[in-house]
Curated annotation (Swiss-Prot):
Organism: Rahnella sp. (strain Y9602)
Protein name from the UniProt record: Class B acid phosphatase
Top-level EC class: hydrolase
Endpoints of the signal sequence: 1-23
Role played: Dephosphorylates several organic phosphate monoesters. Also has a phosphotransferase activity catalyzing the transfer of low-energy phosphate groups from organic phosphate monoesters to free hydroxyl groups of various organic compounds.
Gene: aphA
């Protein structure tokens, strides 16, 4: 009769050992907040468009005048701006007010700028349509410039389609591009900055945002779509 209690004791001991063997170790404390799939699915209310959709929206329309900002819109030109800061005002933005910097930037330093793929597609599309293309930049004007030739070569613009770059400059409290867009009767204007979009909207042109590359020297990055404008997908490069 004593064998049954002993057998039961052995069973309980075995079960307790098994439970101990499979007991979960305490989880380590999380290092970061992490993310769940619902958070990943959240998107900002931005009107995304592709180059093909822009082209389709212009179908049936006669040739128009279109405009492009330069820096961070058609060219990744941070190498020149970075060089200018290092050479003329290390750690500061004062170089942007130095005529010597602009002389160099507008006369050769764009040899180190990279043409953006989105700009190649856009310009090719507008050339095919027969549109007039203008480049309107906030860079300071210099006595000479090679930017026009650089853009012509980078984007394969025929000689009879080339318009000299418009150097609108930068003036405090004033959007210097607005009057130029009006004077050239530009109907579509592409740009990466808020000023580009608001300049277009102020003259009833269609402002379309090109994404500024995250490694651009021009900080902070703007909030694309903040003015209800169209934003081109995959346009950061």
């Amino acid at each position: 009769m004593r064998k049954t209690p002993l057998a039961l004791s052995a069973v309980f001991l075995l079960l307790s050992l098994n439970q101990s063997a499979f007991a979960k170790e305490p989880a380590p404390a999380p290092l970061w907040p992490g993310v769940n799939v619902a958070q990943l699915a959240q998107q900002s209310p931005v009107h995304w468009v592709s180059v093909a959709q822009i082209e389709n929206s212009l179908n049936g329309r006669p040739p128009i005048a279109v405009g492009f900002d330069i820096d961070d819109t058609v060219l990744f030109s941070s190498p020149g701006f970075y060089r200018g800061q290092v050479e003329f005002s290390p750690g500061k933005q004062d170089y942007l007010k130095n005529p010597k910097f602009w002389e160099k930037m507008n006369n050769g330093w764009d040899d180190f700028s990279m043409p953006k793929e989105v700009a190649k597609s856009l310009i090719a599309m507008h050339l095919k349509r027969g549109d007039s293309i203008y480049f309107v930049t906030g860079r300071s004007e210099t006595k000479t410039e090679t930017v026009t030739k650089t853009l012509q070569n980078d984007f394969q613009i025929p000689q009879d389609k080339v318009n000299a770059v418009i150097f609108a400059g930068d003036k405090a409290g004033q959007n210097t591009k607005t009057q130029w867009l009006k004077d050239k009767q530009i109907k579509v204007f592409y740009g990466d900055s808020d000023n580009d979009i608001t300049a277009a909207q102020s003259v009833s042109a269609r402002g379309i945002r090109v994404l500024r590359a995250s490694n651009s020297s021009y900080k902070p990055l703007p909030q694309a779509g903040a003015f209800g404008e169209e934003v081109i997908v995959n346009s950061e490069y």
